[in-house]
């Protein structure tokens, strides 16, 4: 009985230790990816806009040209402060939730040969879906504020026209004053519809690509007879940088390819004018309305800018996450490579 209690205490301590690392690594990865991808995100939101503040753009280059003329370089970074200051928390929760669920669904174990038994893809999908649901609660208010700041713009050549919002705090203040606290969660259903399936795909693709790239790396090392100098021989080596970049970039592209139309729906709901009766009241009504009025192509408006952004931002996110986690593991005297997230 005493040994069982002791083992449970050690297991709980191990989980807390792992979650703590996820929070730190997720914070570093999230902030790095936001800095890399925000200009592309601004262009995407401008193309999806429903506020009426902007002209209709044919493509991302036209939107970029317009914002540079009107506001200069600062225009493409409008709304950056919102995700930059919040992403350290949201990305930490995202990775910590996913990894906790992976450990719950598939505790670390080895086969008869002493090799790690990797998490099945359906369990990785379930963990990613839960993480997507949790993170939706946190990012809906953030995306609402960010999107409203990104689409407000003075007409070209006009300097005397005042903007509706002075900054993130003003968006929050006006929204709560007008709609109450529930107004900050406008678009939450569409965010759930986007992130729950999207993040299931996200982590499955990451796991799949990581395993393929690690296997390729192992084969190359064996062929070159460099086993003595193989970085993977260290139990604390973790995921190599190039693997994190390749697998992370593919995961990011897969996420957007799987759910992009729902992102358009979310943006339409969140950027519609506040001073007018709402055009878009639900996910299904929004899909029906914009399809009837604008056709199927509207669901892919801004897709090119998003895909261009997806690979580098997700690659940076996973690179910094894995690098930070590897560093933390290397400083941890109790780490023994039984980490649930290590696919080696």
From Swiss-Prot:
<feature type="topological domain" description="Mitochondrial intermembrane">
    <location>
        <begin position="322"/>
        <end position="344"/>
    </location>
</feature>
<feature type="topological domain" description="Mitochondrial intermembrane">
    <location>
        <begin position="208"/>
        <end position="238"/>
    </location>
</feature>
<feature type="repeat" description="Solcar 3">
    <location>
        <begin position="239"/>
        <end position="327"/>
    </location>
</feature>
<keyword id="KW-0496">Mitochondrion</keyword>
<feature type="transmembrane region" description="Helical; Name=5">
    <location>
        <begin position="239"/>
        <end position="259"/>
    </location>
</feature>
<dbReference type="Pfam" id="PF00153">
    <property type="entry name" value="Mito_carr"/>
</dbReference>
<keyword id="KW-0813">Transport</keyword>
<keyword id="KW-0472">Membrane</keyword>
<comment type="similarity">
    <text>Belongs to the mitochondrial carrier (TC 2.A.29) family.</text>
</comment>
<feature type="transmembrane region" description="Helical; Name=4">
    <location>
        <begin position="187"/>
        <end position="207"/>
    </location>
</feature>
<feature type="topological domain" description="Mitochondrial matrix">
    <location>
        <begin position="44"/>
        <end position="75"/>
    </location>
</feature>
<dbReference type="InterPro" id="IPR018108">
    <property type="entry name" value="Mitochondrial_sb/sol_carrier"/>
</dbReference>
<feature type="transmembrane region" description="Helical; Name=6">
    <location>
        <begin position="302"/>
        <end position="321"/>
    </location>
</feature>
<keyword id="KW-0999">Mitochondrion inner membrane</keyword>
<dbReference type="InterPro" id="IPR002067">
    <property type="entry name" value="Mit_carrier"/>
</dbReference>
<comment type="function">
    <text>Calcium-dependent mitochondrial solute carrier. Mitochondrial solute carriers shuttle metabolites, nucleotides, and cofactors through the mitochondrial inner membrane.</text>
</comment>
<feature type="topological domain" description="Mitochondrial intermembrane">
    <location>
        <begin position="1"/>
        <end position="22"/>
    </location>
</feature>
<dbReference type="GO" id="GO:0000064">
    <property type="term" value="F:L-ornithine transmembrane transporter activity"/>
</dbReference>
<dbReference type="InterPro" id="IPR023395">
    <property type="entry name" value="Mt_carrier_dom_sf"/>
</dbReference>
<feature type="repeat" description="Solcar 1">
    <location>
        <begin position="17"/>
        <end position="104"/>
    </location>
</feature>
<keyword id="KW-1133">Transmembrane helix</keyword>
<feature type="repeat" description="Solcar 2">
    <location>
        <begin position="119"/>
        <end position="212"/>
    </location>
</feature>
<dbReference type="GO" id="GO:0005743">
    <property type="term" value="C:mitochondrial inner membrane"/>
</dbReference>
<feature type="transmembrane region" description="Helical; Name=1">
    <location>
        <begin position="23"/>
        <end position="43"/>
    </location>
</feature>
<dbReference type="GO" id="GO:0005739">
    <property type="term" value="C:mitochondrion"/>
</dbReference>
<feature type="topological domain" description="Mitochondrial matrix">
    <location>
        <begin position="260"/>
        <end position="301"/>
    </location>
</feature>
<dbReference type="InterPro" id="IPR050567">
    <property type="entry name" value="Mitochondrial_Carrier"/>
</dbReference>
<feature type="transmembrane region" description="Helical; Name=3">
    <location>
        <begin position="117"/>
        <end position="137"/>
    </location>
</feature>
<feature type="transmembrane region" description="Helical; Name=2">
    <location>
        <begin position="76"/>
        <end position="96"/>
    </location>
</feature>
<feature type="topological domain" description="Mitochondrial matrix">
    <location>
        <begin position="138"/>
        <end position="186"/>
    </location>
</feature>
<keyword id="KW-0812">Transmembrane</keyword>
<feature type="topological domain" description="Mitochondrial intermembrane">
    <location>
        <begin position="97"/>
        <end position="116"/>
    </location>
</feature>
<dbReference type="GO" id="GO:1990575">
    <property type="term" value="P:mitochondrial L-ornithine transmembrane transport"/>
</dbReference>
<protein>
    <recommendedName>
        <fullName>Mitochondrial substrate carrier family protein D</fullName>
    </recommendedName>
</protein>
<keyword id="KW-0677">Repeat</keyword>
